[in-house]
Amino acid sequence: MALDNYTYRTFTYLAGDWTGDSAAIEMLHTWNSGHKWGLSFKDIHSETQSSDDSHNCSIKVSLRKRMKLCKKFVIVVGSETANLRSGACYTCFWYKKPDMYNLMPGCYLNNHVDNRSYVQFECEMAKHDYDNDDMDIVVLYNSVNVNRNLCPEPLRWVGTHAAMKKKVTDYLGNNHIEWDYDSVKKAIG
């Protein structure tokens, strides 16, 4: 369905490192779709997808449209989330590097140069909406600990932060790590 058909903020926006933390993001989808779990959200990304051949700038326009329809921003933070570069203009085929004739970087498509990653861009939009009381922010760590140093700077000290995993000791005294549904459910609401 086209996003233009929606007018209210009714969706949840999921963000994160879709390669490094894909298992954690997939677990959120599993909990959301399973009948035995009480987690319930409507993922904006399930409504529309960008094509893989889209330019970074057009993907960011699409992300902005999606964000405007969301009431909650959930980001999964892993060890590399704050360092992601995907989406930065300098990673695009159409990026013009500065040279001796043009001291400023540019775009062969005449678009504005924005060297923020997709995640940085999403976090800054979410923080803006949070500051305007338009959005709740939930930061979930793909870990047993909440480590705000791993969180992208705009969201480091706002919203609800929770770990997605917990340490468990089995009946034999062996320790292992498992998903912490209760922590996630409490954070997302």
Task: Describe the predicted segments one by one.
Residues 1-73, 77-79, 181, 185-189:
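Conserved N-terminal substructure of TIR/SEFIR domains
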Residues 2-7, 11, 141-189:
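C-terminal interaction surface of TIR/SEFIR-family domains
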Residues 19, 80-82, 144-146:
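Solvent-exposed loop/turn segments at secondary-structure junctions
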Residues 129-137:
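A short helix->loop->beta-strand "cap" motif at the edges of active sites that frequently abuts
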Residues 43-47, 71-74, 104-110, 169-174:
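Short C-terminal domain-edge/linker segments immediately following a structured domain
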Residues 27-30, 88-91, 152-155:
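Short, glycine/charged-enriched secondary-structure capping and boundary segments
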